[in-house]
C-alpha cells in the first residue's frame, strides 16, 4: 500500500468508525485493506466471501461516502477476496485478530419488558471471544442482529456443549434491543417451549400460548433438537415457524448438531431449518482458549500469569465452561491456601479434574448410553432383537465404536448387545467401516459421537 493510499484509508476509517458500532466495525471493516487506487476506483482486500457479501450489501456506500468526505472525490469501491488476489485457497484469518474488547465499551443493555428479561446481561457480542473455531458463527450472528429477517432466516447455530451457542443467541437479542427498544424479542429453551405448550393444552390456553410466540419480532429457541420425537410440539412449532417466517420475523435456533443429523425430526421442519444459514462452532484451539482465559481474567479483575493460563489451556480442551471453571477453581484454591498462583499450584488445584480426563477408560455401557441418547432411543433398544433401521443402524454404530474404542473381545461386545454372536459384531464393524468411506453424514455422526464419548 503506498503512503498516500495509506493516509487516505486511515482518515476514512476514522469516519467509518464514527458511523458504526464498535462490534460491527471490528467484524466487517477492521480486517479490510486497500490494495490499489485508479482514477475511478479503489480496490479493497477482504478476508472471505462472507465478509465481501456483507460489505457489498450494507457498507459499500458508507465506505465510498467516507472516502469522498476525505478527498472530495467519489470512487467506485471494489471489494476483492484475498484468495482471488493471491490465486490460492481462501486464506484463514489468524487468531491474532482475536479482539479482547474493553469491557467498558459495552453499551448499556436496554431491558424491553418481560420479553427480554430472560436474556443474560453478560452474554453480549463485546464479551464474546472470537477465534477460528467460532469466527463464522459470530459473523453470521452479528449479520442477523444488524438486519433481522433480512440477512439469514432462520439462522441455525450448532455445536457441542459449552462452546458459545447460547452466548451468541443472547448477544443477538441484546444487540437488536439496543438498536430497537420496541422490538419484541423472545428467548426460550425448547424444553420450556414444550412445557408451556403442555400447560396451555391442559389449561385450555392455546391461544395465549400462540399469541406469546407468534406475536414477536425475533424468536430465539435454544437446543431445538429436543423437540424431535415430540409430535404435538413439532406440530405447534411448525405453524409458529411458518407464521413468523411469512410475517418476515427473525428466527434463530441452536442445536448440538445440524438439522440433517437430528433423528426423529419431521422432514418438514428439517427442510425449514435449512432455509437460511447454518453455522457451526467447533472446539476452541489453543490460541482461542488462551484468549478466553485472558478475557475471563480481565472481566473478573484477576491477575494470572501467562504460563498459568497456558497450563490451563493445555490441560482443558473440551469446552469454554470447563476452561473458565478451571481458572476460577485455581483462584479459589490460591485464596484458601494463601499461596501465589503458579503452575505448581494450578496443577494441585486441577489434579482431580486432570486425572479424571487422563485416566478415563471408555466402556461399552458408556458408548451405548451416548449412542442411544444421540438417536433418541433407549439402551434397551440397542440390546433388543428389533431390526428396524431406526434401531439396527444405531446398534451397528455402537458396535463399531465398541470395537474401535475399547479393548473388549468380539464375543464380549456381542454379549453386551443382547447376547449377540461375535459374527454379528464383525458384520456391523465391517459395514460401518465400509460406509464411512463414502457417507459424509455417517462420518459426521461417528465423529460427533466419538467426541461425546471422549468428553463423557
UniProtKB/Swiss-Prot annotation:
Its main location: cytoplasm. Residues 335-456 are annotated as: Domain IV, binds dsDNA. It is found in: Cytoplasm. GO terms for molecular function: ATP binding; ATP hydrolysis activity; DNA replication origin binding; lipid binding. Keywords: ATP-binding, Cytoplasm, DNA replication, DNA-binding, Lipid-binding, Nucleotide-binding. The keyword Phosphoprotein does not apply. Residues 73-117 are annotated as: Domain II. It holds the Pfam family DnaA_N. Residues 118-334 are annotated as: Domain III, AAA+ region. InterPro entries: AAA+_ATPase, Chromosome_initiator_DnaA, Chromosome_initiator_DnaA-like, Chromosome_initiator_DnaA_CS, DnaA_C, DnaA_dom, DnaA_N_dom, DnaA_N_sf. ATP binds at residues 162, 164-166. Residues 1-73 are annotated as: Domain I, interacts with DnaA modulators. GO terms for cellular component: cytoplasm; plasma membrane. GO terms for biological process: DNA replication initiation; regulation of DNA replication. Gene3D superfamilies: 1.10.1750.10, 1.10.8.60, 3.30.300.180, P-loop containing nucleotide triphosphate hydrolases. Domain I is involved in oligomerization and binding regulators, domain II is flexibile and of varying length in different bacteria, domain III forms the AAA+ region, while domain IV binds dsDNA. PANTHER family: CHROMOSOMAL REPLICATION INITIATOR PROTEIN DNAA (PTHR30050:SF2). Oligomerizes as a right-handed, spiral filament on DNA at oriC. Plays an essential role in the initiation and regulation of chromosomal replication. ATP-DnaA binds to the origin of replication (oriC) to initiate formation of the DNA replication initiation complex once per cell cycle. Binds the DnaA box (a 9 base pair repeat at the origin) and separates the double-stranded (ds)DNA. Forms a right-handed helical filament on oriC DNA; dsDNA binds to the exterior of the filament while single-stranded (ss)DNA is stabiized in the filament's interior. Belongs to the DnaA family. This is Chromosomal replication initiator protein DnaA. The gene is dnaA.
